[in-house]
Amino acid sequence: MALTLTDVKRIAHLARLELPDADAEHTLIQLNDFFGLVEQMQAVDTTGISPLAHPIEQIEDVALRLRNDAVTENVNRDDYQRSAPAVQDGLYLVPKVIE
């Protein structure tokens, strides 16, 4: 996949970024280099290789100490919403920002 200068400028416009032409050309080169690297990685045959959730386990003989997924504090919605400027039916009311 290769991007064009037009693609980079369009993406910058959609992201609401001001991108001068010199920077756009540099960004184009960087993005195309990145996509080239991704294509190289996708070309590698990984059949039979299990995914690594924690790669450090492959080089060190230690078990990662992950905490248990347990509730550590109670959430009291009323306490949090007490300081909100506007709440209705348990939801925060905010001004409309998109038409």
UniProtKB/Swiss-Prot annotation:
Encoding gene per record: gatC
Organism expressing this protein natively: Paraburkholderia phymatum (strain DSM 17167 / CIP 108236 / LMG 21445 / STM815) (Burkholderia phymatum)
Known catalytic reactions: L-glutamyl-tRNA(Gln) + L-glutamine + ATP + H2O = L-glutaminyl-tRNA(Gln) + L-glutamate + ADP + phosphate + H(+); L-aspartyl-tRNA(Asn) + L-glutamine + ATP + H2O = L-asparaginyl-tRNA(Asn) + L-glutamate + ADP + phosphate + 2 H(+)
General function of this protein: Allows the formation of correctly charged Asn-tRNA(Asn) or Gln-tRNA(Gln) through the transamidation of misacylated Asp-tRNA(Asn) or Glu-tRNA(Gln) in organisms which lack either or both of asparaginyl-tRNA or glutaminyl-tRNA synthetases. The reaction takes place in the presence of glutamine and ATP through an activated phospho-Asp-tRNA(Asn) or phospho-Glu-tRNA(Gln).
Gene Ontology molecular function: any one: asparaginyl-tRNA synthase (glutamine-hydrolyzing) activity
EC number per UniProt: 6.3.5.-
Domain of life from the UniProt record: Bacteria
Subunit structure and binding partners: Heterotrimer of A, B and C subunits.
Keyword field: ATP-binding, Ligase, Nucleotide-binding, Protein biosynthesis
Gene Ontology process terms (BP): glutaminyl-tRNAGln biosynthesis via transamidation; regulation of translational fidelity; translation
Family: Belongs to the GatC family.
Pfam families per UniProt: GatC
UniProt cross-references to SUPFAM superfamilies, sorted A to Z: Glu-tRNAGln amidotransferase C subunit (SSF141000)
The name this protein goes by in its record: Aspartyl/glutamyl-tRNA(Asn/Gln) amidotransferase subunit C
